[in-house]
Regions:
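Catalytic Walker B motif of ABC-type/P-loop ATPase nucleotide-binding domains
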Residues: 213-216
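Conserved ABC transporter NBD signature motif
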Residues: 109-117
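Conserved ABC ATPase signature
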Residues: 188-198
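ABC ATPase NBD coupling module
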Residues: 64-67, 118-135, 166
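Short coil-to-helix segment of the ABC ATPase nucleotide-binding domain corresponding to the Q-loop/switch region
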Residues: 147-156
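Conserved catalytic motifs of ABC-family nucleotide-binding domains
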Residues: 209
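The feature captures the beta-strand-to-loop junction immediately N-terminal to the Walker
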Residues: 86-88
């Protein structure tokens, strides 16, 4: 764009016109505004952490034969992510899982779930937080064989005591439908296949809508086909419902499909790798 004006001689002035610059809304603004903007940007970029632990130490056994099972373990799980803990037998994987699940206590360090420090709660308060915030899946599903699939899923709801009888029935039916067992909710667990029983265990882990799911070899008793199906079911639930899943596994195929792999050795996490970078 050129500015066209008449000078005293009547000639046209072809000097390029200066463009009109609209100032950026933060340009020249007070430092506190700029700090607020940076803070808001960083907050958007930060992942939402569902569970974290810091400096977890655990000793097992009597004084004369104590084992240093965990040596300052730190970890964090973000919403919508699946984490695997791998390592040789006896390296501390299950001990860590039980401490994070508030089923055992650490000798030092802390655990935070949904921004609340929970590791130093006692008895009733600890049990309530465990039932509210955590879901568990074990290698052996521990279903009550004479209970129906629906009744097994309702067990954690009864323990928490937040729903009426009709609400518990409806919730259990909804969860069993989600894991593909809507047509078998009245079937006793002993009449279900191994893969179906594990799916009931997944539904039971979700009974109280936990923020975090902890799983100890959740597919260990299944054949490769059902193992993959069970893992893909968990993976889908975690992603769709923005939960966090930490599983202990010896299955390299399952581990490699997780978002993060944490390698343990002698009570330490010696390496953490995102998927595809191990």
């Amino acid at each position: 764009m050129r500015r066209i004006t008449k000078g005293s001689t009547g000639a046209l002035d072809n000097t390029p016109a200066m463009p009109h610059i609209v100032p950026h809304p933060y340009h020249g603004s007070p430092p506190e505004w700029q700090a607020l903007r940076v803070s808001a940007t960083l907050k958007i970029m930060e992942p939402e952490v569902s569970l974290s632990c810091e400096g977890i130490e655990r000793f097992l056994g009597e004084e004369d034969s104590r084992v240093h099972a965990l040596r300052g373990v730190s970890l964090q799980l973000e919403r919508g992510t699946v984490h695997a803990v791998v390592g040789p037998s006896g390296c501390g994987k299950s001990t860590l899982l039980y401490i994070l699940g508030l089923l055992d206590h650490a000798d030092s360090g802390w655990v935070t779930i949904e921004n609340e420090a929970v590791s130093h709660l006692v008895d009733d308060a600890l049990a309530r937080k465990r039932n509210e915030l955590l879901g568990f899946i074990f290698q052996f599903h521990f279903l009550l064989e004479d209970f129906t699939a629906q009744e097994n899923v309702m067990i954690p709801m009864r323990r928490l005591g937040a729903l009426s009888e009709s609400e518990m029935h409806a919730r259990a039916a909804q969860l069993l439908e989600a894991v593909g067992l809507g047509n078998k909710l009245k079937r006793p667990s002993r009449h279900l296949s191994g893969g179906e029983q594990q799916r009931v265990a997944v539904a039971r882990a979700l009974a109280n809508n936990p923020s975090v799911i902890l799983a100890d070899e959740p597919t260990g008793n299944l054949d490769s086909k059902n193992s993959r199906r069970a893992f893909e079911l968990l993976q889908r639930i975690v992603q769709e419902e923005r939960k966090a899943l930490l599983l202990v596994t010896h299955n390299p195929e399952i581990a490699e499909a997780c978002d993060w792999i944490h390698e343990m050795q002698d009570g330490l996490i010696v390496g953490s790798h995102p998927r595809g970078f191990r």
